[in-house]
Amino acid sequence: MAALQTEPHQRVALVIQYLGTHFHGWQRQLKHRTVQEEIETALERVLGHRVTLHGAGRTDAGVHAAAQVAHFDATGSIPPEKWAAILNSRLPTDILIRASAAVSQNWHARFCAKSRRYRYTLYTDSRPNLFVQPFSWHYYYQPLDESLIEAALQPLLGQHHLAAFHRAGSRRSHSWVEVQAAECYRSGSFVHIEIQANGFLYGMVRLLVGLLVNVGSGELSLDSFTQLWQQERREEVKSAAPARGLCLLRVGYPEFPFPPEVWYDTQPQFVLPSVTDVQKEASQEQQTTSFSDSASPVPHLSCTPVPVPLHK
């Protein structure tokens, strides 16, 4: 009897962008909408059989991704670079495949990754802004000193046992993490905290940011912060930062099959003017413009794209 022939398959890697607001995280879950399930469903409609999508990391409910990486094995003759367009025509508008490419059969989105980089964004203007609300923690209660947060981050560089920032429920057998880079910087009304590591514990970044905000506001001293995580006092890390401010920026590989422009944080961004900038502009126009009646001048809001410096 002739041997049963199986259809050859090719491994395809994807760079994925998604808005986490209406997802219950990355990983497929029963009775909950997830990113993995949406993409697998789209793949199965095209291929006609079950497909497993392997992601580089599992983001929590409400967390965004600018450049998540995943792979799947495809049968048929569809060119790997065509999968991005094919999937985008079938996916909901809160998921975008930025690129697709062929990779070797032993390439794995999770196990070949050497780093993951996250950015947490805090919006510090006292007035709410609906355009930034879904992507930031509106923290205006107390002034934040980003230099204190930066100072608190530096001792974390290197390999450490970070059990203090480990939420219950993780399947990971240890709490060792190699923090490769960490920084805090301000851009107008926004404070950004970026952390890159070989991997992250369950809930680590949000627990860490929740504590760093206490350092930046002066509620917690630098020494107390360092002692807390070095002594693994998990019971004192009580509150996590809101999920909406967290974004998976990029995943690092020794050999990456995509061009650099797939990374979202290398692109110019449109920055909305702050309330202070609008008030200053209105004041200047009032001083320089004469009006024939008593009507108040309307400030001109510029929509010029402002390049945001690349932080690596």
Regions found by a protein language model. Give the residues of each.
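Structured-RNA-binding interfaces characteristic of tRNA pseudouridine synthases
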Residues: 2-293, 297-312
